[in-house]
Regions:
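Class I S-adenosyl-L-methionine-dependent methyltransferase catalytic core
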Residues: 1-314
Length: 314
């Protein structure tokens, strides 16, 4: 006789499970799957941050050939999902590569305490101007020289939804925050020497060459990046998460599987790879010139970006 392995679940349990699912979906505002697609946020303020980001060119000058066409133009949309999912209102969210200022603007708008640091003075000044336009009189700090906004000797504090937004200028291999003080980290690391960021000699990937030395190797670049993520590990609370937005790239005709190459360096620190999300960029049109170059070089156009989720040990 054939056995019936079906188990009956009481209707009240099914109802409770569905109610909890709806509660979480209302909180997150998206289905938590491993493949994400571009969509607007349906929030006037957040959409304005997205439009502001695209209009003003908040990202470094990218070479289409380096990333085979994949540009991180929808970063604020990704940030909104990640911040809602991995943090709660009142949590401390930080970014050690502050050229991604939309991440912090989104975090602040969602009721998180947002802080960031960046080495590049030009990015820093651009970000300060952007934040001042959005949130007047924020605390603008310099972790090395201890002056405010390059002019005022006063510590300025202003509040948006009761939260402080602090921006620091300095090398992220030495973060200014205490051990186990942060709740979530969101960042997009530099792309070796494929993209020009600034002339600071401490700049990962290009700094030594700018200072007159030899250009670092790819492995030396990853070791330097490891020092930044070691600091992120230090300041993040046990059991909390970090999201790293990155993509693979080409340099000197060599394909670098950046998203995979980074993982062993992270695990050496103590990070646990918790998840990988694929962000689909297929709605971004390819430029005609670039399409013809893809055909000539037999490269596939990248229409995705990786989001690696790491977790600090409990």
């Amino acid at each position: 006789m054939k056995k019936d392995y079906k188990t009956s679940v009481p209707q009240e349990k099914l109802d409770a499970s569905e109610a909890e699912r709806q509660r979480l979906l209302a909180k997150w505002r998206f289905e938590p799957t491993s493949m994400w697609y571009l969509q607007r946020l349906h929030d006037k303020t957040l959409d304005a941050i997205v439009e502001d980001t695209l209009a003003e060119g908040s990202y470094p000058e990218h070479n289409f050939n380096v990333r085979d066409g994949a540009l991180p133009q929808s970063s604020p949309i990704v940030a909104e999902r990640l911040i809602r999912f991995f943090s709660e209102p009142g949590d401390w969210v930080f970014n050690p590569f502050m050229e991604r200022i939309p991440h912090l603007l989104v975090a602040n708008y969602l009721g998180r305490n947002a802080v960031g640091q960046d080495l590049c003075k030009s990015f820093y000044e651009h970000d300060v101007a952007k934040v001042k336009r959005r949130i007047a009189n924020n605390a603008i700090l310099d972790s090395e020289h201890n002056y405010i906004d390059h002019e005022e000797p006063t510590y300025l504090r202003s509040y948006l939804n009761g939260l402080v937004f602090d921006l620091y200028l300095g090398d992220s291999r030495c973060l200014p925050w205490s051990n186990n003080s942060m709740d979530f980290c969101i960042n997009s690391p530099p792309y070796f020497s494929t993209i020009y960021y600034s002339d600071e000699p401490e700049q990962l990937g290009t700094g030594e060459a700018i200072g007159g030395g030899d250009k670092p190797t790819y492995e030396e670049f990853l070791k330097g990046l490891q020092d930044v993520y070691r600091e992120c590990y230090r300041v993040l609370k046990p059991g909390k998460f970090m999201a790293v937005l990155l993509n693979d790239f080409r340099m000197d005709k060599i394909f670098r599987a950046y998203h995979a190459d980074l993982i062993p360096y992270m695990e050496e620190i103590g990070w646990h790879l918790h998840d990988i999300i694929i962000y689909n960029l297929s709605l971004h049109p390819l430029q005609a010139v670039f399409t013809s170059q893809l055909a000539r070089d037999f490269h596939m156009a990248k229409q995705h970006e990786y989001i690696e989720i790491y977790r600090k040990s409990e």
